């Protein structure tokens, strides 16, 4: 009995030491976590303050300026060129008391016809609401398809000589995998309620009546596009059937065809046309706060999960 006491005491001391060490490690981890959380919180507050200050300075002062709104990239929901972002920016630009003219800076290959139509309609509405503020479009590299749909909502369109302009048409594309499926011995099993619900299914043979319907669908949208272009350009548009064929042209050729009004850049239009050299960017991009919140949210979630897993593992031991 006496010989076993020292061993029992040593085991107890070892367990106590191990438990204390585990608690110390756990406390250290949580301490680091809360320090990082505090740092992130303070950084977030600082970012909000900086972002608020920069927003407050937009359009500040009593000097007249040219308001610029960018339509850059694919016009689609959730993008910087989405209807929500562009329309919001246009509203702010027209609302600013120091705005002398608004320039939509286009650099887009197109996108959703629904989004483009919404932006176009808002441009026309704001122009009618603020008749004293002219609205221009300036093309950088490319203004095609839905991008041009948006541009024709402006009073005048200015391009660079080498800009790519046009593509007034509608596109629907996809792939067919039936040949590959036959080689692999894969059978397609498609069950629908509604005989046309599986129209243009890439894993089923092409049905001619589906193609006819799809062409009619695109033709309807194409006619809407043509109507918008004719409404926006009016008599400036030359009588040339190829204009609506989906072709693209250089900026210089687009002026000859009446698709654009002249050669110019953002700076030259602000200086010579609007006659307000100061350019204020009203583009509604993802803010610093939104970007930080999105990234921090993902990082914080990852840290919490990792911490929970570690603590759970310590508890099992």
What are these regions (language model features)?
Residues 167:
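Extracytoplasmic ligand-binding site segments that recognize negatively charged/polar headgroups
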Residues 1-137, 141-160, 171-317:
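N-terminal organellar transit peptides
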């Amino acid at each position: 009995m006496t010989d076993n006491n020292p061993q029992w005491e040593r085991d107890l001391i070892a367990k106590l030491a191990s438990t204390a060490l585990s608690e110390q490690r756990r406390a250290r981890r949580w301490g680091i976590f809360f320090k990082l959380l505090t740092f992130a919180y303070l950084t977030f507050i600082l970012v909000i303050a900086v972002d608020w200050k920069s927003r407050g300075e937009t359009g500040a002062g009593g000097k007249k300026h040219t308001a610029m709104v960018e339509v850059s990239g694919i016009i689609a929901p959730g993008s910087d060129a989405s209807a929500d972002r562009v329309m919001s920016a246009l509203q702010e630009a027209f609302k600013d008391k120091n705005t002398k003219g608004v320039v939509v800076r286009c650099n887009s290959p197109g996108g959703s016809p629904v989004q483009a139509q919404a932006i176009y309609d808002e441009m026309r509405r704001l122009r009618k609401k603020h008749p004293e503020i002219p609205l221009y479009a300036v093309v950088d590299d490319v203004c095609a398809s839905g991008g041009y749909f948006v541009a024709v909502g402006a009073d005048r369109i200015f391009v660079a000589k080498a800009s790519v302009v046009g593509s007034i048409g509608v596109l629907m594309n996809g792939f067919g995998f039936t040949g590959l499926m036959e080689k692999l011995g894969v059978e397609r099993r498609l069950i629908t309620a509604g005989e046309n619900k599986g129209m243009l299914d890439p894993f089923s043979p092409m049905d001619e009546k589906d193609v006819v319907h799809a062409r009619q669908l695109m033709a309807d949208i194409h006619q809407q596009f043509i109507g918008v272009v004719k409404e926006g350009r009016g008599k400036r548009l030359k009588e040339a059937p190829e204009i609506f064929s989906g072709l693209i042209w250089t900026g210089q050729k687009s002026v000859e065809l009446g698709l654009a009004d002249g050669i110019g850049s953002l700076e030259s239009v602000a200086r010579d046309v609007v006659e307000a050299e100061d350019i204020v960017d009203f583009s509604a991009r993802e803010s610093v706060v939104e970007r930080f919140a999105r990234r921090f949210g993902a990082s914080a979630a990852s840290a919490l999960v990792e911490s929970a897993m570690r603590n759970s593992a310590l508890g099992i031991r």
